[in-house]
Amino acid sequence: MEIIEIIKEFKKDISTILKDKLDRVILFGSYARGDYDEESDVDVLILVKEMPTLKEKQKIIKIASRYSLKYDILISPIIYKKTIKTSFIDEVENYGVEV
């Protein structure tokens, strides 16, 4: 399965937890650039309208772990509030792949 399809499925699963809090999911890093190898992790930025609770974050990590085992990849989710603006967020928004 293509990485984009895996991340779309991941987004669908986390949206059941985050519901209206979820704004966007962006693939970034080596998989977005296309220069990944078998050691690369899958960097995923989760932009939210409102920060999830600790319990919701734990569920997201659990889902990422499940996907990592199922597809033999390491999904590394990072959660940011969409109103936070940093050079990191700007770079991900400019060069990442929205899923």
Curated annotation (Swiss-Prot):
It is an enzyme of class 2 (transferase). It catalyses: L-tyrosyl-[protein] + ATP = O-(5'-adenylyl)-L-tyrosyl-[protein] + diphosphate; O-(5'-adenylyl)-L-tyrosyl-[protein] + ATP = O-[5'-(adenylyl-(5'->3')-adenylyl)]-L-tyrosyl-[protein] + diphosphate. Keywords: ATP-binding, Magnesium, Metal-binding, Nucleotide-binding, Nucleotidyltransferase, Toxin-antitoxin system, Transferase. Mg(2+) 1 binds at residues 41, 43. Gene3D superfamilies: Beta Polymerase, domain 2. Putative antitoxin component of a putative type VII toxin-antitoxin (TA) system. Its cognate toxin might be MF0142, which it might AMPylate. This is Putative protein adenylyltransferase MJ0141. It comes from Methanocaldococcus jannaschii (strain ATCC 43067 / DSM 2661 / JAL-1 / JCM 10045 / NBRC 100440).
